[in-house]
Amino acid sequence: MTTHAPFRVDHVGSYLRPKDLVEARAKFANGEITREKLTAVEDKEIRELVKKQIAAGLKGVTDGEFRRAYWHLDFFWGFNGIEHRVGKHGLKFNGVETKADTATLTAPIDGHNHPFVEHFKFLRDLVKDEDVIVKFTIPSPSQFYFELIFTPENIAAWTSVYPTEKELFEAIKNAYVDVITDLYNEGLRTLQFDDCTWGALADDGFIKRFDADRPLEEVRRDFVGRALQLNNSVLGVLPKDLVVNTHVCRGNFQSTWIAQGGYEKVEDELLAGEYVNAYYLEYDTDRAGDFKPLAKVSDGKKVVLGLLTSKFADLEDKDEVIARIKEASQYVPLENLYLSTQCGFASTEEGNILTEEDQWKKIALISEIAQEVSGK
């Protein structure tokens, strides 16, 4: 068996939260149950989820992000020096707004004793006798940086601790290396950086929000350079036998989106320059553009085409998906192409607008298509 992701039948990582878990999290938030009781429910539901993933033929299993409210913020809150705060408003998606939670830097940061290490160890022990590996997902370093600069309040907070951006970057790098080293020492060999910054940087509207006074492309190049520098500063010092892949999307909250724009605007940095093994790329709608930027993918790197949507229940036409895979093979060799949904089924605890049965039908369709394309 291949010992790391991607796999021919693959997924991004998050799954719809079961009813019992949703209820337990609500009770914990209201002070009705203890942390220990919530953890017991989480453990139970993760065990069931792993069984379902294995039954569906997935070889890289996750915990569904069942211990998180958000795909990214819970990880940030695990750093020493970061506080969970509530801002003035949430992120405005297409027709809906998230809760106003944020991560604010209030003291020098480090990644020692990060709670996600225990999350990994539970999953590791759960599958130790199975013919699968653990794929562990965390937000990218660049995603952390963009959280810290997204509001004036967060900017004021970090600049009171780190006088320069150079010092902040070094602190972020070291904090990430702290956590990843601990994960590696506990046995992790496949890590996934989830990263919405590239999708935002491909969107002209987002670029204008970062800096409306300078020329748009000048601002884009500036921030794209920062994202690449920060991610590679971490990737470049990790153990060689730790496989790190990255997932790029344009927002996934209650079946809506937040950004649009093709990869051509970030292709040199993302597809040619980032030190990752594989790219999980959103491609379920025209908002992601065409396949031409894939020509920039470095030799030997793998691309997981997110051609099926995790946002809605309707199943894609198998022949159309196969035709798109063949189209993409003009730019990346077919043996280096893989298939998944464009994102997870529940990037936040609210989840997308489909049922648990629907999400497994999507995985089954991925399996069917992958077998037909590979001939196995």
Task: Name what the model sees in each region.
Residues 1-376:
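Domain-level signal for soluble alpha/beta catalytic cores
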